[in-house]
Amino acid sequence: MKPTHTALIAMLLMSGPALADGGVSVPLPDTSGMPAAEAKALMSELAQVNVITSNCPDYALDDEDWTLITGTGDRLAAQLGLSAGDYDREFYGPAFKLLDDPQACDRIGPTAAPLIERLKSMGGGTTPTTASQ
């Protein structure tokens, strides 16, 4: 990927609402002043909740909640200058390993709602701002 494309993608991820594959867009929290260590801890939590809620039917999320979680993780990755490969390796690799633990769904799944509330308290939201036509 050309450097200008990478910079453009990073700018898009760091500004405005996030758009889900289904066309749902939600406002993302302001993470611009978050220290790197705190951002990485939040990214780990976001990846774990994303993997568990996507793979454990009892804890499935709606499109708006999912978009808030994934959009925030993407924004933080861009903020920290992580490539897609580094982001997957550092955060999603360990999160997917949780699926080997039969207790992971019931341990991580209930943390989704408090995480979403935390993101809302930081300025994020789950009310769609646009929808696909």
Feature names for model-found ranges:
Residues 1-7:
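Bacterial N-terminal signal peptides that target proteins for export
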Residues 15-17:
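N-terminal signal peptide c-region/cleavage motif recognized by signal peptidases
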Residues 26-82:
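Short N-proximal segments of mature Sec-exported proteins
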Residues 27-28, 64-133:
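Compact alpha-helical subdomains of small soluble proteins
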Residues 8-13:
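Hydrophobic helical h-region of N-terminal Sec-dependent signal peptides
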